[in-house]
Design a protein with these regions (language model features):
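Conserved metal-phosphate-binding beta-hairpin within the catalytic cores
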Residues: 12-38
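Structured, non-catalytic alpha/beta "coupling" segments that mediate domain-domain communication
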Residues: 80, 90, 295-324
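Catalytic cores of soluble metabolic enzymes centered on carboxylation/carboxyl-transfer
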Residues: 3, 21, 38, 42-278, ...
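A conserved acidic, glycine/proline-rich C-terminal tail/linker
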Residues: 279-297
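Structured functional modules or segments
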Residues: 331-410
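Long, charged amphipathic helices and adjacent flexible linkers at domain junctions
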Residues: 69-75, 185, 190, 318-343
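Active-site phosphate-binding and catalytic loops of NTP-dependent enzymes
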Residues: 8-15, 62-70, 300-301
């Protein structure tokens, strides 16, 4: 009623959003009116069954408002989350970059996805970093929460950091579930909501290792000699040894934990020695990122997105991030070195940590670029040697400019 009174007082006709702020005693106070459709218009549309964008076009074309307020009924409950390319762990600093993997829930009754981003698109630093909206409807708030949880479980993004994990934590928090929240909710529950990811389980490590082995096999399948003998050493991917099983080591990083997974090649699969167990694994790639596998006798379907030396894994709706070390970088790090050593956005070089001829290990800090009052670290994508520095401290560089020449060592 207060919103209608405000609109009538200024003879406003069209879509608009009136905002109020409420106190704990349910007193509310006028905040502002935006004379336009807002980001949250989908919530109203789901509750009313009306298309507000269509309304706005019709009104702009001179037509009358399609319905009067008394003709509009509200049904159910709707919740909207905004998916942002940002890093909650660093005070929500924007995370520009290329999107290498994107999988969003599909539209269906009770669920709406607003998105214009595709794999290969760039999230730039010049605009608001929102990349999608997910809106879920239910007969009541409990049903809507269940729907939004399920939708967030199905959301996968790699290449840029996002707030998807934070959103999942919020909608699962008991205080939020019970409606006990306000604008200080995140700060109040920061320790819970921003909790660091738990260490990857052996099952996750096995999935990541299997993915690397399958990708390696796929990568060299066109270069080996086909002898028609599946047990011929010339048909093995790597590490063949006379009179002994072929073995290899896949070197991973889980947060700050270095992990060496010992691999023994066996007919039809691999035997893995993991930190807390050993297991036999086998499987196949389905498309670019999906893996159908048997891990230690457990049949699973997982998703793995490889971006340079970083592995994003989704298993049982949980996202884990592993990094490849040393030889495992041979898959893609060399190909991605150029991208990793170019300026992510226009900015000024503030620090140079290496000189020409410096030999560095993977992950070493090479340069610091300042842009939009934020620092961006330029990291060595693999073990290697700095061949040439193209810029010095104080130099201004344009986006995608190659900052240095680097020779990887695999």
């Amino acid at each position: 009623e207060a919103a209608l009174t405000a609109a009538k007082a200024i003879h406003y006709v069209g879509a608009g959003t009136v905002e109020f702020i409420a106190d704990p005693a349910d007193n509310f106070y006028f905040l502002e009116m935006n004379t336009r459709i807002q980001v949250e218009h989908r919530v109203t549309e789901m509750l009313t069954g009306q298309d507000l964008v269509e309304w706005q076009f019709r009104i702009a074309d001179g037509e009358q408002v399609p319905l009067q307020q008394k003709q509009i009924t509200l049904r159910g409950h709707a919740i909207e989350v905004r998916l942002y390319a940002e890093n909650p762990a660093r005070n929500f600093v924007p995370s520009p970059g290329l999107v290498h993997h994107l999988r969003l829930p599909k539209d269906k009754p009770g669920l709406c996805i607003d998105n214009s981003l595709n794999v290969g698109d760039e999230v730039t630093p010049y605009y608001d970093p929102m990349i999608a909206k997910i809106i879920a409807w239910g007969g009541d708030r409990k049903d809507a929460l269940h729907a939004i949880k399920r939708a967030l479980n199905e959301t996968q993004v790699a290449g840029v950091k996002t707030n998807v994990q934070l959103l999942s934590q919020i909608v699962r928090h008991p205080e939020f579930r019970d409606g006990n929240y306000n604008t200080g909710f995140i700060a109040l529950h920061q320790d819970t909501l921003m909790a660091q990811s738990v260490s990857a389980s052996d099952l996750v490590l096995a999935l990541g290792t299997l993915f690397i082995l399958l990708k390696r096999k796929e990568k060299i399948s066109g270069t080996v000699v086909d002898t028609k003998d599946p047990y011929s050493p010339w048909n093995e991917e790597d590490s063949w040894r006379l009179n002994l099983p072929a073995q290899d080591v896949i070197q991973l990083m889980d947060g700050g934990r270095e992990i060496d997974v010992e691999v023994t090649f066996i007919p039809g699969g691999y035997h893995l020695s993991l930190p807390n167990s050993s297991m036999t694994v086998s499987g196949a790639l389905v498309g670019e990122s999906d893996v159908e596998a048997i891990l230690g006798g457990i049949q699973i379907k997982g998703t793995v997105a490889l971006n340079g030396h970083e592995l994003n894994l989704w298993l049982y709706d949980v996202n884990h991030i592993l990094k490849l070390r040393d030889r495992a970088l041979a898959l893609d790090a060399v190909a991605d070195t150029v991208d990793n050593l170019s300026a992510p956005m226009p900015g000024r070089i503030t620090q140079v940590m290496v000189g020409e001829g410096t030999v560095v290990r993977s992950g070493a800090l090479l340069m610091v670029l300042e842009a939009m009052k934020m620092e961006h670290n330029i990291i060595a994508p693999s073990n290697g040697k700095v061949e040439k520095l193209n810029f010095s401290v104080g130099d201004w560089v344009d986006e995608n400019t190659m900052l240095l020449d680097f020779s990887p060592v695999i």
